[in-house]
From Swiss-Prot:
PANTHER family assigned to the protein according to its UniProt record, in alphabetical order: SUCCINATE DEHYDROGENASE 2 MEMBRANE SUBUNIT SDHC, SUCCINATE DEHYDROGENASE HYDROPHOBIC MEMBRANE ANCHOR SUBUNIT
Name of protein: Succinate dehydrogenase hydrophobic membrane anchor subunit
Principal location: membrane
Pathway(s) the chain acts in: Carbohydrate metabolism; tricarboxylic acid cycle
InterPro entries on file: SdhC_prok, SQR/QFR_C/D, Succ_DH_cytb556, SuccDH_FuR_B_TM-su
GO cellular component terms attached to this protein's record: plasma membrane
Keyword Transit peptide (UniProt): no
Length: 130
């Protein structure tokens, strides 16, 4: 049985600089997954206001949509969702053995495509916010 050794806090803190593209893809995929789970609970809590009537639900939505920070968070949610979807498709292909030798390139392509989609969508989300 192998034993781990204590490298010290300074050495452990600097390990993130040694991450490869595959490790960053894993970290981002886990992070975006947790963000989406958190959003799901927020979404359900907003939808639950409809149980109190249409007026309460509509006033809740109009109140949230009038806040600029909510509009910015929607753009962030779009970025998180698009990256998670694209990286998930990339992982599916890698698991099937397609593109194994180009994993790094496909990860960077998913980042670029996420950026393009989000930048193209910004006017839709921020219209009337400011």
């Amino acid at each position: 049985m192998s034993e781990s050794y204590d490298r010290g806090l300074v050495a452990d803190f600097g390990r993130w600089t040694e991450f490869s593209a595959g490790m960053w893809a894993w970290v981002f995929h886990k992070f975006t997954g947790w963000v989406l789970v958190g959003y799901l609970f927020t979404h359900i809590s907003v939808l639950s206001t409809s149980l109190q009537g249409a007026q309460v639900y509509n006033s809740t939505l109009s109140g949230l949509e009038s806040l600029a920070i909510v509009r910015l968070l929607e753009v962030g949610l779009l970025a998180v969702a698009v990256f998670h979807i694209l990286n998930g498709i990339r992982l599916l292909f890698v698991d099937l053995g397609v593109g194994l030798e180009a994993q790094d390139k496909s990860f960077y392509a998913s980042l670029v495509l996420t950026g393009v989609i989000v930048v193209a969508s910004v006017p839709t989300f921020l219209t009337g916010a400011f």
